[in-house]
């Protein structure tokens, strides 16, 4: 009897076939992804615990500084943030990759829509569980496929709660991801400390480039220490034309051509950027131009003003950190990614704290008492993350436009907007950025394969 029942099932199967036929092919391709075979992988914290899991990225070993983020979403933006250059990023969210990885599509300004830079910047990825089957209308590949294509090793199936507990108690530590082999204690000397590397030099453009609104109303110079695409978008969408300069460009020598100066985010120890600090100090001595800095830009501005910076025990990396505006008493929920902070007690007398972190009381911003200069440690452009503080870009652009108007009153012939010829000559995106370690590994493997052939 049961045999007769099961033989009667084809009609139901044909109905399912018709349903499948009505589903878009791209979605079905997502659903039908084959579960890949995983190699063994090991995540080792130097002088600390060892965690065994499965590799789902590039088949290569890597070392760097292990840091963690508690952000629930936004892994494509986080992993392409130049501020993570040289770091192994541990995600506390239990499941990562469920909405895949989008394409490198660009918007009307030529800026990447879904990434913060063209390449995956983190040295390695650590997750508790990775979604091998993803679904999102913008997705074109899985997190594992993306990591493999970018040469970045990634490990899943490890106890990220234990890892984060260790990092919170001991502080950010050097670590390594080893794929396809057992951990060897004799390899400890191979641990790479990104804090000893001038990371900003790696991620900064090597030549100026220009991005502009369709009808720019002001012209802003951006100091590129590893600028995120959404910072550029936040400026351009408010009517600014922007020319982006290398981190060590003597901006004080050309500031009179601009209506404002912006200092970007970036990776590593701020004290490595001695050239930037010097040029900013000279800029504040010789010009009244409005200045805005974010993250590393905030720290560099503080150093230029005469303050000091300190390294945090494990940093602040999340989308939900409360920061108090000391001028209004308003609390903002902010997006953050930094391992250093400004020591507010060392601010000169003509500066005052602007924001303070309500979790650890660290400084989150500063403002000049008499000039249009301010900076924030958190990211008001927040992609991903809350937009509570995005109005700071409005405040900055307003000050830029006021400065432009005041300069026009004194210098009627002054035109801060670049000539069309200059705009045509300048590049439209970063120039000469040093490839990530992952991309270097891929290039080396390709060279070796070609030589063997």
From Swiss-Prot:
It comes from the Eukaryota. Its main location: mitochondrion. Pathway: Amino-acid biosynthesis; L-arginine biosynthesis; carbamoyl phosphate from bicarbonate: step 1/1. Its EC number is 6.3.5.5. Coiled coil: none annotated. It is found in: Mitochondrion matrix. This is Carbamoyl phosphate synthase arginine-specific small chain. Small subunit of the arginine-specific carbamoyl phosphate synthase (CPSase). CPSase catalyzes the formation of carbamoyl phosphate from the ammonia moiety of glutamine, carbonate, and phosphate donated by ATP, the first step of the arginine biosynthetic pathway. The small subunit (glutamine amidotransferase) binds and cleaves glutamine to supply the large subunit with the substrate ammonia. Heterodimer composed of 2 chains; the small (or glutamine) chain promotes the hydrolysis of glutamine to ammonia, which is used by the large (or ammonia) chain to synthesize carbamoyl phosphate. Keywords: Amino-acid biosynthesis, Arginine biosynthesis, ATP-binding, Glutamine amidotransferase, Ligase, Mitochondrion, Nucleotide-binding, Transit peptide. It comes from Aspergillus fumigatus (strain ATCC MYA-4609 / CBS 101355 / FGSC A1100 / Af293). NCBIfam families: CPSaseIIsmall, PRK12838.1.
């Amino acid at each position: 009897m049961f045999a007769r029942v099961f033989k009667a099932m084809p009609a139901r199967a044909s109905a399912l076939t018709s349903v499948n036929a009505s589903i878009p092919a791209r979605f079905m391709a997502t659903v039908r992804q084959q579960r890949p075979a995983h190699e063994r992988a090991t995540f080792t914290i130097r002088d600390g615990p060892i965690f065994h899991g499965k590799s789902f990225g590039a088949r290569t070993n890597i070392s760097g500084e292990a840091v963690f983020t508690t952000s629930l979403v936004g892994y494509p933006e986080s992993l392409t943030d130049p501020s993570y250059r040289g770091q192994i990023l541990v995600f506390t969210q239990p499941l990562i990759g469920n909405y895949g990885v989008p394409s490198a599509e660009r918007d009307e300004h030529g800026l990447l829509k879904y990434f913060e830079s063209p390449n995956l910047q983190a040295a390695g990825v650590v997750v508790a569980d990775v979604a091998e089957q993803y679904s999102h209308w913008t997705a074109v590949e899985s997190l594992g496929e993306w990591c493999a294509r970018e040469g970045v090793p990634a490990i899943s199936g490890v106890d990220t709660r234990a890892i984060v507990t260790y990092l919170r108690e001991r502080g950010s530590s050097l670590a390594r991801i080893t794929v396809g082999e057992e951990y060897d204690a004799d390899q400890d000397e191979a641990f790479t400390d990104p804090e000893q590397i001038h990371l900003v030099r790696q991620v900064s453009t090597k030549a100026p480039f220009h991005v502009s609104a369709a009808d720019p109303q002001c012209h802003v110079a951006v100091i590129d220490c590893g600028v995120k695409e959404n910072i550029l978008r936040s400026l351009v969408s408010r009517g600014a034309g922007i020319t982006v300069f290398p981190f060590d460009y003597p901006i004080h020598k050309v500031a009179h051509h601009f209506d404002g100066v912006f200092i970007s985010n970036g990776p590593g120890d701020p004290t490595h950027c001695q050239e930037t600090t010097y040029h900013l100090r000279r800029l504040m001595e010789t010009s009244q131009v409005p200045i805005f800095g974010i993250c590393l830009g905030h720290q560099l501005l503080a150093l230029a003003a005469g303050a000091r910076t300190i390294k945090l025990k494990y940093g602040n990396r999340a989308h939900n950190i409360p920061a108090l505006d000391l001028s209004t008493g308003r609390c903002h929920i902010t997006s953050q990614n930094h391992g250093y902070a400004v020591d507010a007690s060392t601010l000169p007398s003509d500066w005052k704290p602007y924001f303070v972190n309500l979790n650890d009381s660290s400084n989150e911003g500063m403002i000049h008492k008499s000039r249009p200069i301010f900076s924030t440690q958190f990211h008001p452009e927040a992609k991903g993350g809350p937009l509570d503080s995005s109005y700071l870009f409005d405040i900055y652009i307003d000050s830029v436009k006021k400065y432009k108007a005041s300069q026009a009153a004194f210098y009627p012939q002054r035109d801060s907007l670049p000539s069309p010829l200059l705009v045509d000559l300048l590049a439209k995106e970063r120039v000469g950025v040093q490839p990530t370690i992952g991309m270097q590994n891929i290039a080396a493997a390709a060279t070796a394969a070609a030589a063997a052939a």
